Amino acid sequence: MANKWVYTFKEGNMSMRNLLGGKGANLAEMTEIGLPVPQGFTITTEACTQYYEDGRKINDEIMSQAMEGVAWMEEVNGKKFGDLENPLLVSVRSGARASMPGMMDTILNLGLNDEVVAAMIKGNPDPAFERFVYDSYRRFIQMFSDVVMEVGKKYFEQLIDKMKEEKGVKFDVDLTAEDLKTLAEQFKAEYKNQLGTDFPSDPVEQLKLAIEAVFRSWDNPRANVYRRDNDIPYSWGTAVNVMPMVFGNLNNESGTGVAFTRDPATGENKLMGEFLINAQGEDVVAGVRTPMPIAQMEKEFPEAYAEFLKVCDTLENHYHDMQDMEFTVENKKLYMLQCRNGKRTAPAALKIACDLVAEGHKTPEEAVAMIDPRNLDTLLHPQFDAAALKAATPLGKGLGASPGAACGKVVFTADDAVEWAARGEKVVLVRLETSPEDITGMKSAQGILTVRGGMTSHAAVVARGMGTCCVSGCGDINMDEENKKFTLAGVEFTEGSEISIDGTTGNIYQGLIPTVDAQIAGEFGQIMAWADQFRKLKVRTNADTPADAKKARELGAEGIGLCRTEHMFFEEDRIAAFREMICADTVEAREKALDKILPYQQSDFKALYEALEGCPVTIRFLDPPLHEFVPHEEAEQIKLANDLGKTLDEVKAIVESLKEFNPMMGHRGCRLAVTYPEIAKMQTKAVIRAAIEVQKEHADWNVKPEIMIPLTCELKELKFVKKVVVETADAEIAAAGVDLKYEVGTMIEIPRAALTADEIATEADFFCFGTNDLTQMTFGFSRDDAGKFLDAYYDAKIFENDPFAKLDQTGVGKLMETAIKLGKPVNPALHCGICGEHGGDPSSVEFCHKIGLDYVSCSPFRVPVARLAAAQAAIAEK
């Protein structure tokens, strides 16, 4: 049987999301439950894959099935595509299986041409209708030119602005039919000017080009960035939805809106949305005109509003989740154009999940599974200091579109935001309105401020998804983009001016207001308590200071999975002694210098044990090459020479001798302990003495040090270092006359260690996968240099993700799995964890659960993310 590439809305349902995309599956589902949906069809995600396989062309079979879909639509709707008497006009919209707001392209009013426009006007002499037809036509030419033919929107915007200026009006709605007719002609001329061909008038050709454009938009730069950030595979493809147009811009009895069944910023159980009279859907979402609140719709269209409230209830009860809906009213009649589970802020996600359990819609397991772990990061984001905020006077106010507090220097373009942020500047991106092209700048900014657009504009939706503070629709701003400045309440802001914005209240302030850490609400505790019931993986933290350890404990960490000891050497009072050790000529001189460092290390470790209150602490012995600890500036070298009674030339010779061609694979990790066993001895004494002290002071704590040897690649190497550690530790314990248990394990960060894990496990009490180095060593590229070529790899579709941010499960993951399978049978008591940056990435945590790790360890602020991801992995496995 030939492939079925096209499904009408009557043939699908919500279980067919992978084939029909989210939008198509939900349109079919709404049709099935009897809601007012204009009847159209969906071209499948498989057709998108086929389009790319066929060299970015739509084959005849797909097109012929699409035309059968059009014939079905004609029959159901009683209109004909391209007909002069009763024309069927359609919208063509994308819809991937995962929601990607504003990332892909939409075309409205398709099927119009000069003849159809003339025939429509002839059939209805009402001047308002004539205005509507020309309005629809000029919109179609502009959208088609921009989305399908890639002629920039700006050329058309300039023509509109010029026309409004000539006519002395502020809004598009104030332009007359004659003005819009002139614009349509100007737009077609601009199209020809840009492309050298006439605007296509054949509706079938328009449709084919539009379908191709939606498929093509799956691979546009902003969609690729969004996919990479949201773990959406390139192979999924997008579906295309073709449906009859309903016109919110028909007259003043019509309108369009976007609404959420609950507040997407706070989670409060109340309808939140916006509505525009005499407008098309894109006007609300694109944020071109600032709309009115949804409640006002009751005054304008009482019957349609009453029906809409019923639809909201039906959808929430059907999907058991907060819904984001797009709808249009045409001549007072309601039509539903889309529904999906709404994007929401992290606080809203937690509140909605807890409320849905309380209302009987969800079980605790389902509530835990419905929250995106990455969003939890945003909960822990700063707010303004309350006292400083009270003393500050807002200059103006927009809509609080995405919560949090942001302050920084004003920049006006996405490129400037990226450039300034790369220099270490904190910036706030100020735009008339954002468009999907601004995504990289939005990611680099501390906050986003827009002049136009509501709570459902592009800026608002994307900022909420990224957890970036956003204030939208501040119409009091007088913007001069050309000269990179704006005025608000008489104050002029230029590039680099300091500004603060509050994404919760929408307030805008001059200058920088200090921020404080976020306060976590009750729902967070509830969700985390449920998550902890379901997860099997333990979650530890990577922390080198008591303050970090304490923060991580507050956020639920169950121990330290990685304490990097080298950070402790860099402090002013210790670095001198460590440099003395490096420059020493004999073992005795080295030991003498290390004895000066010992009390510092011991007090550091003691403070960490105290912060962890008996939870496990894994201490990694010295890892970086010694070259990193010596001075490279001549002034400091002179000081060191004077301190040590050496000549400058002698110090320079030592520094020079430590230089390496490839330090990442050089004299570092356990290789330092093999060359200088006295370093490992000193560190062992510090660890054990600190543990003995804390054990004596807190008899009820189970203090059991875990000593971790870095960068092992060979059993004999581990044996050598372990012998130094065990002899030193046992002597300390015997001298103190106490009973203290400790463990010696190793990092697995060299492929050879993973492949010989059955040998290494005979000497190791635990394995900890250092996936930062393991990724570097497996791929053979350096984390510090990969940025230079990774973008080219994304563009060429060689990689979809940064392997340093998201664990490479097929290569690095296979090495981890191999190490566990080889190690555990030899040493059944062996426990295994991960302490690279991947420990806080949800998809990597899920993989760690699958291969049977005992714990993951991540930075303190990612501990809640890992706890939730670990619970979701356990729930998904059931």
Whereabouts are the PLM-identified features?
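Nucleotide/phosphate-binding sheet-loop regions of phosphoryl- and nucleotidyl-transfer enzymes
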Residues: 1-392, 425-428, 435-440, 446, ...
